């Protein structure tokens, strides 16, 4: 009975793909195999976490009667452009359930956004929820770039038996080397990354505005010593996580402890 109710609720939330998603998906098909099926969108799914908060997700639903494997994408950058077509519709039309999930404190998800901190536990809670879904057939893969790759390594710390593959793009399981390559603070790269994390889930215009603001103020920020609180010129406010990274250059809070060798534990 509970399974029937879940299926009914999922059907009621399912809508057609937005026009911009259909457009960019068509443009991205060039050179790819023809779509295997049509795709619908189930928006605003609430995934419960152990602390009582919920994380929001959208599911791109392949319109086929066959049981479909699931692709999990966990991101702090929002569930809109470009992830909606690039990972969502484009992969779903080849027979995958694509679950695009906003990480803690981003994109409407509950809790506080503390980069790199809760990804392992939240990923495991997501897998537990997946097991209860009538459309989940027990076959799981993950995909994503940059921070979306880090969320995959966080899951790989203790890979669930359902995990069959990971597609980690331009990412790392330890971001300390990104902040301090060779031991020196990478100011431009770090500030650019912070600008993206602070604004990308707010939509295209706020994101581009934040990047432009950083470009216009970077030279002034680079001349300011100490960098804390000088960097505020770039963002208009203080960023606690950035100050923690600057205050503890030898600490490695950004590592998952999952080295690439962890992939050997993923079920084949």
Where do the model's predicted regions map?
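Short glycine-enriched nucleophile-adjacent loop
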Residues: 148-160
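Alpha/beta-hydrolase fold nucleophile elbow
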Residues: 134-147
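Alpha/beta-hydrolase active-site loop
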Residues: 114-134
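Short substrate-entry loop that stabilizes the transition state in hydrolases
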Residues: 64-68, 72-110
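Accessory cap/linker subdomain of secreted extracellular hydrolases
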Residues: 2-16, 157-159, 165-266
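Catalytic nucleophile serine of serine hydrolases
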Residues: 146-149, 170
């Amino acid at each position: 009975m509970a399974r029937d109710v879940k299926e009914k609720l999922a059907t009621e939330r399912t809508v057609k793909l937005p026009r911009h998603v259909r457009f960019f998906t068509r443009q991205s098909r060039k050179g790819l195999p023809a779509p295997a099926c049509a795709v619908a969108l189930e928006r605003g799914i609430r995934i419960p976490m152990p602390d009582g908060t919920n994380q929001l997700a959208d599911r791109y639903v392949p319109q086929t009667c066959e049981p479909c494997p699931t692709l999990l994408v966990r991101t702090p950058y929002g569930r809109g452009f470009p992830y909606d077509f690039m990972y969502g519709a484009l992969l779903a039309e080849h027979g995958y359930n694509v679950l695009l999930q906003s990480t803690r404190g981003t994109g409407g998800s509950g809790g506080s956004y503390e980069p790199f901190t809760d990804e392992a536990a939240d990923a495991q809670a997501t897998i537990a929820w997946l097991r209860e879904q009538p459309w989940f057939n027990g076959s799981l893969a993950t995909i994503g770039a940059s921070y979306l790759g880090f969320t995959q390594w966080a899951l790989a710390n203790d890979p669930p038996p359902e995990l069959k593959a990971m597609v980690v793009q331009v990412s790392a399981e330890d971001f300390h080397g990104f902040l301090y390559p060779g031991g020196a603070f990478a100011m431009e790269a770090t500030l650019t990354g912070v600008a993206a994390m602070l604004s990308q889930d707010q939509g295209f215009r706020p994101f581009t505005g934040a990047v432009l603001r950083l470009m216009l103020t970077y030279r002034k920020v680079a001349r300011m010593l100490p960098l804390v609180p000088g960097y505020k010129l770039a963002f208009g406010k203080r960023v606690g996580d950035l100050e923690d990274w600057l205050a503890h250059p030898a600490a490695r809070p950004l590592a998952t402890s999952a080295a690439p060798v962890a992939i050997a534990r993923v079920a084949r």
